[in-house]
Amino acid sequence: MSLSDNFADSLISAPPIRVICLVGPTGAGKTAAALHLARTFGGGVVNADSRQVYRDFPVITAQPSPEERAVCPHLLYGFLPSTEKISAGVWTDKATVVIEELCREEPGHNTSRQATSRPDGLVPLLVGGTGLYLKTLLDGIADIPRVDPAIGARLERECDALGAPALHARLASIDPDYAARIHPNDRQRAVRALEVHEGTGHALSWWHARPVPRPRYAALRIGMDMSLDELTPRLDRRIDLMLEAGALDEARAARTVCDDPAAPGWSGIGCAELYRYLTGELPWAEARLLWLRNTRAYAKRQLTWFRADKRIHWVRPDDLDAMAALACAFLRGETAE
């Protein structure tokens, strides 16, 4: 039995731990909001972004800077090599452990916690735009049976031969709901969804809709309220800032560690486009345009996912006082979520 299994068992009769989630599309200001709440209440940040787990791409995936990390503990950022896959289940196991660690940790000198009824320990702040990760952690997810690894290996070979868009098209005919949530070039998720369907006889979205155990956390969900039209110029500017911060050099260095475009770490938006530029597949103007276009499309999918969750409190990213008021009431137990 793993440490996370032991922890989950211990929560069966315990009151749920209160966590705060900051969600929304990429580039909307989740990091700044998290740092404000961390300073206000004494919090620690847990990454809930599937691309920010990769250590070779801190700039391109917009991981918090060293200065931002100095404000409070930041967990589950940049801990995986580019060659290693991660799933919602694996992330949930790791997040379960670090949330427990935060609940035992004392606030540092950079925080000035407002009075709440919360016991000692840091407030877990789950920050990111990977909706499935948060759904798996907070709502639970059906226990998908183990699939024969040979199926996944064969699908990986097919992806090498045909390309990720071909597998995505196949997935769309089998599981249109899940296919609509992922990018056509998202090799890892397309292969996983096809693998589950072939190995279990059911689509991944069918498994995700199965009844699940009682949630282990009470969660306040705060969404960054920004339209796609507002977000687009911010995303364009953010690409410029990433380039100024060394995104191209970062991609060149990452190739010396892993020069396989099919590796999970290279699947992130920005990473894939820069790889194609560095290998001469795309001219610079086309690579940058594709980077922005794919980022915008991803933000649109994120907005669709999160807008469907009626538990989310939508707040303008610059209205930090409103976020703090929601968090204060939640931590005092005045609101359920």
UniProtKB/Swiss-Prot annotation:
Gene3D superfamilies linked: 1.10.20.140, P-loop containing nucleotide triphosphate hydrolases
EC number(s) recorded for this UniProt protein: 2.5.1.75
Binding site for substrate: T26, G27, A28, G29, K30, T31
Cofactor: Mg(2+)
Enzyme class: transferase
InterPro entries attached to this UniProt entry: Dimethylallyltransferase, IPT, P-loop_NTPase
Binding sites annotated in the UniProt record for ATP: G24, P25, T26, G27, A28, G29, K30, T31
Key word tRNA processing present: yes
Keyword Iron applies: no
Region entry Interaction with substrate tRNA, spans: 49-52, 188-192
Domain of life: Bacteria
Keywords: ATP-binding, Magnesium, Nucleotide-binding, Transferase, tRNA processing
Protein task: Catalyzes the transfer of a dimethylallyl group onto the adenine at position 37 in tRNAs that read codons beginning with uridine, leading to the formation of N6-(dimethylallyl)adenosine (i(6)A).
Family membership: Belongs to the IPP transferase family.
The protein's name: tRNA dimethylallyltransferase
Species the sequence originates in: Nitratidesulfovibrio vulgaris (strain DSM 19637 / Miyazaki F) (Desulfovibrio vulgaris)
